[in-house]
């Protein structure tokens, strides 16, 4: 049976969000969450989790190109641990290198420069993170 999974693209000003099904391996973007220095409105996150009832969440890890961690990687991990602590949801991690670049390219190709809104880029990045996770975990 398939799982519902939500992915987050953590950022200090915006946290992208996407939802998908393991059975199809596809994701759709959801509205991004505004954040203040990486802290979202937890009530908004809770509302999203209650609406979609995910079996788990995937948090993108912004690694350096050589695979090492940076400050933002540690903050993304902290965000994931808080999701688990606050809502009891299982959290998995996914390398997100180059997803923002790929998301910008896809959005630009569809709608040009004006379509490149930060929240939209972050949520498309979350889709790419989730689809990558599905590819690496076909069993769900």
Curated annotation (Swiss-Prot):
It holds the Pfam family RuvX. HAMAP family: Nuclease_YqgF (MF_00651). It is found in: Cytoplasm. GO terms for biological process: rRNA 5'-end processing. GO terms for cellular component: cytosol. It comes from the Bacteria. Belongs to the YqgF nuclease family. This is Putative pre-16S rRNA nuclease.
């Amino acid at each position: 049976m398939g799982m519902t999974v939500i992915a987050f693209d953590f950022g200090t000003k915006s946290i992208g969000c996407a939802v998908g099904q393991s059975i199809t391996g596809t994701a759709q973007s959801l509205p991004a969450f505004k954040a203040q220095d990486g802290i979202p409105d937890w009530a908004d996150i809770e509302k999203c989790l209650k609406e979609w009832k995910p079996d788990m969440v995937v948090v993108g890890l912004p690694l350096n190109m050589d695979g090492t961690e940076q400050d933002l990687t540690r903050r993304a991990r902290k965000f994931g641990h808080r999701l688990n602590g606050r809502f009891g949801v299982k959290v998995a991690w996914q390398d997100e290198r180059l997803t923002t670049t790929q998301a910008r390219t896809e959005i630009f190709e569809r709608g040009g420069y004006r379509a490149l809104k930060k929240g939209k880029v972050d949520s498309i990045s979350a889709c790419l993170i989730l689809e990558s996770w599905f590819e690496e975990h076909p069993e769900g």
